[in-house]
């Protein structure tokens, strides 16, 4: 056998085909959500009664940003039928980031320069319904068009024109794709585990930290220092200004991931501080409320703890709350399987040709 037909060469060919199957190929989109995998399925609840999840899943590494939400608005809110934009996103200096322009039927949305580019800061002034619609849009492949069943009104959640009242369960199947939703709002247990759990605690038996910075000690609030256990909150001075004085027009949000040495065990950032984050509680019927956790930039350390939670009305546009999305563990798309099979067929053809010589 010649060197070109060596077992090593054939093994390389097969490895390439398998790599294609393991690496989903997705079309370019306006918004990319960086995800981390939360493993260690079957962990027990914390003493607070939260955190047990018996399956692997993924969750956003960062909070959804102002730029990402502006892209969403520009895709589906030329006519903003269901109030996805709140004017406070432009007028409230502490968190301002998106300004509305254009004309009725052709509304546009631009990221503000609010004491520096606002684009990588977390979006706020969103309610449960707006978060569900963003999740639907992501689950539907980020389509462009009016707010209807194929863009914002169905997908992960059948919101169907509602902006108040009882919230719907998460769909097991996205009716627009025939598959489980690829993005959704994390349940409270999913959010909690990603923030506070570590399988290395208690001698490898697993356990929970008090803060989402892998610490039981309350954090500092210095960004960009390379020092761990830091977060955007008020520890006597505000993290952004380093001053105890509150200024109404001052931005107080930090870029997502600014505290780069302070991830959770699974690699998420800012689940303590910056902004509170919406969660979907149990993910099943919960009346007209949603959950928020994590604390924010004006809170003291007490509200950043794992024991602190709130359950506001789902229709509340909270100026102190944003969100991150969750997703199932990635499964290769059909096109990826086709590529892998093509690679295997190529390997087989090469092997047959070489043997025939």
Specify the residue positions occupied by each region the protein language model found:
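Short, polar loop/linker segments at the starts of domains and inter-domain junctions
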Residues: 44-61, 222-236, 302-320, 351
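Disulfide-stabilized, aromatic/cysteine-rich ligand-recognition loop
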Residues: 29-30, 258-264, 285-331
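Active-site microenvironments of metalloenzymes and redox enzymes
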Residues: 51-52, 58-188, 194-222
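A short, hydrophobic C-terminal helix/tail in secreted or cell-surface proteins
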Residues: 333-350
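Short, well-ordered junction/capping motifs at the entry into regular secondary structure
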Residues: 117-119, 170-178, 224-227, 232-272
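Bacterial N-terminal signal peptides
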Residues: 11-23
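Short, charged juxtamembrane terminal tails flanking transmembrane helices
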Residues: 354-357
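Bacterial N-terminal signal peptides that target proteins for export
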Residues: 2-14
